[in-house]
C-alpha cells in the first residue's frame, strides 16, 4: 500500500509540474502574442495617422475653409449642392431665326447695377434662385411664355430638401438679360419637370412631366404665374417630356413612355392626337414612332416650333450621356396614319472651355419664341458635368483611399510587422494558442477544411517572398520603400480630391445675380513665344475670358494657328518696342474690364475669377495680385516689405484688372506725358506710373485693391533669360529711381496705406 501511494504521489507531482510548465508556456506565448498585436497596432495607427494628417493638410491648402465665395451661395445654405443629376443652369440666345442664335454676350449688353459689362450666360442659375430664398440644386427644362414685352420663364428646380423637381418661375422685362425669380409655381408630392406652358381659348395651361405617378396632368392658371389648379388628367400614361403642337386643325401630343415592354429608354417616342388639348387623346397608328438608339434625338428636348412655314421638333441626343446635345428635326409628314421627320443642321455656339463653361459638357433643352421686335429669343439649359458625375467621383475617391490602405498593409509586409496574411492557426491545427503576426488575428482551430488551409498557407508565403524580393535593408530596398510611401500619399490626396474637390470645373463668381467677361491682355515679343503658347492655352480656358489681345512689341508675330486657344486671339503688332504700348487705347476691346497679365505668370483660373469679381465691385480701382508698399525712403521692395508693414499702397499691373477706358485714357493723357517719356528712358516702370495716376484720380479714396493668389502661382521669369527683371538688383534700382521721379511729378504715395485682411471673404489675407 505504501509503495502504491508513493508511486501515485510521484505521478501526481509530475503531472502538476507539466501543468505548471504548460501554464507558464501558455502565458509566455500569450505575452508574445499580445506584444505582436501591440506592435501591429502601433504601426498601423502611426501610418494611418500620418496619412490622415497629410490628407487634412492637403485639403486645408487646396480647399481652404477660411476663404469663401462672395455673393455666391454660402456654405450654410441648402442650395447649389452637388447633385448626381448635374448642375444645370439656363442661358439666353438671340438671332434673326431659330437657326442663327448667338449667346447674349455677343450682343454686348451692359448692366451697371450688377457690374456686368457685358452680361454673359448663364442668366439664371441655382445661385440666383437660392439667394432669393428658394433653395435649388439646379435649374433645367426652360419654357417661355410671352405677354407683350414681359417674358415669363418656367423651369424645373431641383429641391435640395425633398430631392425632387418643382416648377419655378421667373420674369424679365429687358428681353431676357435680367431675370427676377418669382417663386415656386407648382409643387406636388411627386417629381415635376418639363413645364410646357401654352394658351388655349384665353386660358393659360401647364402640362408638366409627372411620370412618377403614371399619368399626364394638365393644370390651369388661377392667378398667373404662381397659382395653378389641376384641370384634368389628360392621359393615364407615364409620358416624359411631352409637348403639344397644333397642326392642320389637330392637336398632337408628342412624348415618350419608357415603361412599356421592350421600350428603349431615351430612344422611344409616341404620338397621340385630339381635337382639343383637353382630350380625348387617341394613339397614332405608327406608335411607337421611335424605339431604338438613344442618339437619334427621339426624346423631346423642348417645344416644337413653327418657322418659315415648316414645323420642327426638338429632341435630345442621349447617346454618349443623358442630355448630351440638342437635335432638331423638320417634320415632313404628320397625319393620323403617317409621321416622317428629317434632321436638319442645328448648333448653338459651343464653348471650347469644357467643364469651365456653363454648357461645355452638355445641353439638352431648347425653347424658342419670336419677340414683338421680330427677333427670336431662345432659352437653353446647359451643364458643366455629365449625369452621374458625383457618384463616379465618390467611387473613385474611396477606391483611391482603399488603395492607400493597401499600400500601408504592403509596408507592413515589407517591414516584417505583418508576417502572414491569414493566422497560422487557420492553416495548421497544432499552432492553436501560439503567437501569430497575421494581418487578421482570429485564431479558431478546426473551422476550415484542408483545402482552405492549403490556400492560407500559400497566401502566407507572400510576405516573406516580398521581403526577399525587395530586400528592405538594401539601398534599392530603402528606395522602393520610399516610393511606396510616396505612392500612398499620392493616393490619399487623390482620394481627398475626388471626394471633396468637386467636379474639377472652375466656376465664375456672380455679382448681384449676373456674370460678365473681360479681355485678357499681355505684352510680349518673339523671344518669348514659348511663354505665349503656354499662356494662351492655359488662360483661354478660364470661364470669364472673352478675348486675348497680344501686344506684340518686337520681331515677326506668330501665326494664330500656332496658338491653342478656346477664345478669339488678336495680335496687335506695335511700331515701336515700348512698355507704354501696354496701355495703348484700343477701340476694338469690347469689354469694360481688361486683365493685364504678364506672359510669365502662371496662376489658377480660380484666382483670376476672384480678382475679376472684386474688380466688378469697385471698377474705379486697380485690382491685382502683387502688392507693394512705398515708404519715405522711396526704395522699391518686394512683397515681404509690404507684409512687414501690414499694408500696401501699390499694385503691380503685371497681374491687375482695370477699367480699359478710364485707365488707358488716363495713361495716354497729356498729364502723363512726362511719365511716359521716363518709362521709355528706363524701359521700366509703366506699372508704377499707372499707380501714381490712379492715386491722383482717386483723391482721398482707395485707388488699389489686393487679392491674394493661391500658393500654386508660378513666375516663370525666374527660369527665363529674357525677362527685364532678370537682374533683380539692377531692376530694383531702376524702379526706386522711378518712384522718386513720379513722386516729383504726381505727388507721393507715402501717405496712402491699406491693410491686408479687410474683406469678409478672406480673399486679401
UniProtKB/Swiss-Prot annotation:
UniProt topology in membrane: Multi-pass membrane protein
Annotated keywords: Disulfide bond, Manganese, Membrane, Metal-binding, Transferase, Transmembrane, Transmembrane helix
Gene3D superfamilies named in the record: Glycosyl hydrolase domain, family 43, Spore Coat Polysaccharide Biosynthesis Protein SpsA, Chain A
Positions contributing to Mn(2+) binding: 600
Top-rank EC class of the record's enzyme: transferase
Disruption phenotype: Loss of the GlcN(Ac) glycosylinositol phosphorylceramides (GIPCs) leading to a reduced sensitivity to abiotic stress (e.g. abscisic acid and salt) on seed germination. Reduced HexNAc-GIPC content. Slightly larger seeds with more seed storage lipids and proteins and larger seed coat cells.
Catalytic reaction annotation: an N-(2R-hydroxy-very-long-chain fatty acyl)-(R)-4-hydroxysphingoid base + a 1,2-diacyl-sn-glycero-3-phospho-(1D-myo-inositol) = a 1D-myo-inositol-1-phospho-N-[(R)-2-hydroxy-very-long-chain fatty acyl]-(R)-4-hydroxysphingoid base + a 1,2-diacyl-sn-glycerol
One Pfam family cited in the UniProt record for this chain: GINT1_N
Gene Ontology biological process terms in this record: lipid glycosylation; protein glycosylation; response to abscisic acid; response to salt stress; seed germination
Induction: Highly expressed in dry seed but drastically down-regulated after seed imbibition.
Cofactors, names only: Mn(2+)
Matches recorded under InterPro entries: Exostosin (IPR004263), GINT1_N (IPR056442), Glyco_hydro_beta-prop_sf (IPR023296), GT64_dom (IPR015338), Nucleotide-diphossugar_trans (IPR029044)
Active site: 687
GO-annotated cellular components: membrane
Tissue: Specifically and highly expressed in developing embryos and mature seeds. Also detected at low levels in stigma and pollen.
Function: Glycosyltransferase that mediates the glycosylation of glycosylinositol phosphorylceramides (GIPCs), the major sphingolipids in the plasma membrane; acts as a HexN(Ac)-specific GIPC sugar transferase and accepts glucosamine (GlcN) and N-acetylglucosamine (GlcNAc) as the sugar unit. Responsible for the glycosylation of a subgroup of GIPCs found in seeds and pollen that contain GlcNAc and GlcN (GlcN(Ac)). Maybe involved in the maintenance of cell-cell adhesion.
The family this protein is said to belong to: Belongs to the glycosyltransferase 64 family.
Listed name of the protein: Glucosamine inositolphosphorylceramide transferase 1
Organism field: Arabidopsis thaliana
Amino acid at each position: 500500500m505504501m509503495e502504491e501511494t508513493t508511486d501515485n504521489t510521484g505521478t501526481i507531482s509530475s503531472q502538476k509540474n507539466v501543468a505548471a510548465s504548460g501554464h507558464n508556456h501558455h502565458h509566455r506565448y500569450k505575452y508574445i502574442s499580445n506584444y505582436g498585436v501591440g506592435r501591429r497596432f502601433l504601426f498601423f495607427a502611426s501610418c494611418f495617422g500620418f496619412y490622415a494628417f497629410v490628407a487634412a493638410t492637403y485639403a486645408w491648402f487646396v480647399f481652404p475653409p477660411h476663404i469663401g465665395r462672395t455673393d455666391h451661395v454660402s456654405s450654410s445654405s441648402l442650395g447649389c449642392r452637388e447633385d448626381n443629376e448635374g448642375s444645370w443652369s439656363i442661358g439666353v440666345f438671340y438671332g434673326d431665326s431659330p437657326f442663327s442664335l448667338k449667346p447674349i454676350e455677343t450682343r454686348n449688353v451692359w448692366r451697371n447695377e450688377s457690374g456686368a459689362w457685358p452680361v454673359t450666360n448663364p442668366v439664371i442659375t441655382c445661385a440666383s434662385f437660392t439667394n432669393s430664398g428658394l433653395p435649388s440644386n439646379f435649374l433645367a427644362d426652360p419654357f417661355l411664355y410671352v405677354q407683350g414685352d414681359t417674358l415669363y420663364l418656367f423651369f424645373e428646380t431641383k429641391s435640395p430638401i425633398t430631392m425632387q423637381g418643382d416648377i419655378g418661375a421667373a420674369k424679365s422685362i429687358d428681353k431676357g438679360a435680367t431675370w427676377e425669380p418669382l417663386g415656386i409655381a407648382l409643387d406636388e408630392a411627386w417629381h415635376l419637370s418639363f413645364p410646357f406652358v401654352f394658351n388655349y381659348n384665353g386660358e393659360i395651361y401647364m402640362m408638366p412631366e409627372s411620370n412618377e405617378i403614371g399619368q399626364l396632368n394638365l393644370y390651369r392658371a388661377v392667378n398667373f404665374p404662381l397659382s395653378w389648379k389641376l384641370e384634368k388628367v389628360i392621359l393615364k400614361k407615364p409620358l416624359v417630356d411631352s409637348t403639344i403642337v397644333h397642326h392642320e386643325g389637330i392637336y398632337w401630343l408628342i412624348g415618350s413612355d419608357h415603361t412599356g415592354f421592350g421600350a428603349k429608354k431615351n430612344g422611344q417616342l409616341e404620338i397621340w392626337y385630339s381635337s382639343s388639348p383637353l382630350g380625348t387623346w387617341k394613339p397614332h397608328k405608327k406608335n411607337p414612332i421611335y424605339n431604338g438608339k438613344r442618339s437619334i434625338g427621339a426624346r423631346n428636348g423642348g417645344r416644337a416650333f413653327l418657322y418659315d412655314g415648316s414645323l420642327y421638333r426638338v429632341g435630345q441626343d442621349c447617346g454618349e450621356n443623358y442630355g448630351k446635345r440638342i437635335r432638331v428635326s423638320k417634320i415632313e409628314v404628320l397625319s393620323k396614319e403617317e409621321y416622317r421627320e428629317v434632321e436638319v443642321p442645328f448648333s448653338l455656339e459651343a464653348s471650347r472651355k469644357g467643364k469651365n463653361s456653363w454648357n461645355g459638357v452638355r445641353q439638352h433643352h431648347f425653347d424658342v419664341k419670336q419677340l414683338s421686335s421680330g427677333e427670336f429669343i431662345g432659352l437653353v439649359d446647359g451643364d458643366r458635368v455629365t449625369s452621374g458625375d458625383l457618384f463616379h467621383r465618390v467611387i473613385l475617391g474611396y477606391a483611391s483611399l482603399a488603395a492607400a490602405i493597401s499600400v500601408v498593409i504592403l509596408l507592413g509586409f515589407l517591414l516584417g510587422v505583418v508576417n502572414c496574411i491569414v493566422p497560422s492557426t487557420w492553416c495548421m491545427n497544432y499552432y492553436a494558442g501560439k503567437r501569430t503576426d497575421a494581418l487578421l488575428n482570429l485564431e479558431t482551430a478546426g473551422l476550415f477544411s484542408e483545402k482552405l488551409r492549403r490556400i492560407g498557407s500559400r497566401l502566407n508565403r507572400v510576405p516573406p517572398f516580398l521581403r526577399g524580393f525587395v530586400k528592405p535593408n538594401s539601398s534599392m530596398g530603402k528606395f522602393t520603400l520610399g516610393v511606396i510611401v510616396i505612392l500612398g500619399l499620392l493616393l490619399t490626396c487623390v482620394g481627398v480630391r475626388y471626394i471633396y474637390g468637386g467636379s474639377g470645373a472652375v466656376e465664375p463668381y456672380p455679382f448681384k445675380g449676373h456674370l460678365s467677361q473681360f479681355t485678357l491682355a499681355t505684352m510680349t515679343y518673339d523671344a518669348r513665344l514659348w511663354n505665349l503658347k503656354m499662356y494662351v492655352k492655359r488662360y483661354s480656358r478660364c470661364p470669364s475670358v472673352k478675348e486675348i489681345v497680344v501686344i506684340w512689341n518686337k520681331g515677326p508675330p506668330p501665326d494664330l494657328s500656332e496658338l491653342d486657344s478656346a477664345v478669339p486671339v488678336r495680335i496687335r503688332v506695335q511700331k515701336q518696342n515700348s512698355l507704354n504700348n501696354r496701355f495703348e487705347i484700343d477701340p476694338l476691346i469690347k469689354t469694360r474690364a481688361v486683365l493685364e497679365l504678364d506672359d510669365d505668370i502662371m496662376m489658377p483660373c480660380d484666382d483670376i475669377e476672384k480678382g475679376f469679381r472684386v474688380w466688378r465691385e469697385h471698377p474705379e480701382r486697380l485690382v491685382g495680385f502683387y502688392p507693394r508698399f512705398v515708404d519715405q525712403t522711396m526704395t522699391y521692395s518686394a512683397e515681404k516689405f509690404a507684409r512687414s508693414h501690414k499694408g500696401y499702397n501699390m499694385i503691380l499691373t503685371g497681374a491687375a484688372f482695370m477699367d480699359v477706358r478710364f485707365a488707358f485714357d488716363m495713361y495716354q493723357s497729356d498729364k502723363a506725358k512726362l511719365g511716359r517719356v521716363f518709362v521709355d528712358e528706363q524701359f521700366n516702370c509703366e506699372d508704377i506710373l499707372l499707380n501714381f495716376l490712379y492715386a491722383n484720380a482717386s483723391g482721398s479714396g482707395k485707388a488699389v485693391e489686393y487679392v491674394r493668389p493661391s500658393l500654386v502661382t508660378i513666375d516663370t521669369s525666374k527660369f527665363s533669360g529674357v525677362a527685364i527683371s532678370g537682374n533683380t538688383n539692377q531692376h530694383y534700382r531702376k524702379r526706386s529711381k522711378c518712384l522718386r521721379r513720379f513722386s516729383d511729378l504726381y505727388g507721393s504715395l507715402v501717405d496712402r496705406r491699406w491693410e491686408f485682411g479687410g474683406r469678409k471673404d478672406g480673399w486679401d489675407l
